[in-house]
């Protein structure tokens, strides 16, 4: 694929994720948008790694590292959302006042 096409696709994914993260009122949707942003960043890592230095796999290795961190972040985030839902019966961001006390 051409470098510009991948960069445009990655920029679209990043902007969709950023828009969803800013406008989201639901915690689960915000986590999904954050994962979309991380996937756009991973696409950039792999694309630039392949385009500039094909012999070394630094971008691919860093991409795998980011995927592992994102999986842990999603698991912890969903556990927190599940706990908040059990206690508050809502996953809306503006109704969560846990940190205000």
Curated annotation (Swiss-Prot):
Keywords of this entry: Chloroplast, Membrane, NAD, NADP, Plastid, Plastoquinone, Quinone, Thylakoid, Translocase, Transmembrane, Transmembrane helix, Transport
Subunit structure of this chain's protein: NDH is composed of at least 16 different subunits, 5 of which are encoded in the nucleus.
Top-level enzyme category: translocase
Residue stretches spanning the membrane: 2-22, 32-52, 61-81
Disulfide bonds: none
Gene Ontology biological-process annotations: ATP synthesis coupled electron transport; photosynthesis, light reaction
Membrane topology: Multi-pass membrane protein
Gene Ontology molecular-function annotations: oxidoreductase activity, acting on NAD(P)H, quinone or similar compound as acceptor; quinone binding
PANTHER family to which the protein is assigned, alphabetical: NADH-UBIQUINONE OXIDOREDUCTASE CHAIN 4L, NADH-UBIQUINONE OXIDOREDUCTASE SUBUNIT ND4L
Compartments, as annotated in UniProt: Plastid, Chloroplast thylakoid membrane
Job description of the protein: NDH shuttles electrons from NAD(P)H:plastoquinone, via FMN and iron-sulfur (Fe-S) centers, to quinones in the photosynthetic chain and possibly in a chloroplast respiratory chain. The immediate electron acceptor for the enzyme in this species is believed to be plastoquinone. Couples the redox reaction to proton translocation, and thus conserves the redox energy in a proton gradient.
Gene Ontology CC terms, in alphabetical order: chloroplast thylakoid membrane; NADH dehydrogenase complex
Listed name of the protein: NAD(P)H-quinone oxidoreductase subunit 4L, chloroplastic
Catalytic activity: a plastoquinone + NADH + (n+1) H(+)(in) = a plastoquinol + NAD(+) + n H(+)(out); a plastoquinone + NADPH + (n+1) H(+)(in) = a plastoquinol + NADP(+) + n H(+)(out)
Family, similarity comment: Belongs to the complex I subunit 4L family.
Keyword DNA-binding: no
Main subcellular location of this protein, as a coarse class: plastid
EC number: 7.1.1.-
């Amino acid at each position: 694929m051409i470098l510009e096409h991948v960069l445009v696709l990655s920029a679209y994914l990043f902007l969709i994720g950023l828009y969803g993260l800013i406008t989201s009122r639901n915690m689960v949707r915000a986590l999904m948008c954050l994962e979309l942003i991380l996937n756009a960043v991973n696409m950039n890592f792999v694309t630039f790694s392949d385009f500039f230095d094909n012999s070394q796999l630094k971008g691919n290795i860093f991409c795998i590292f980011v995927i592992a961190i994102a999986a842990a972040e999603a698991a912890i985030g969903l556990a927190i959302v599940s706990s908040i839902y059990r206690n508050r019966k809502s996953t809306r961001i503006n109704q969560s006042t846990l940190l205000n006390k």
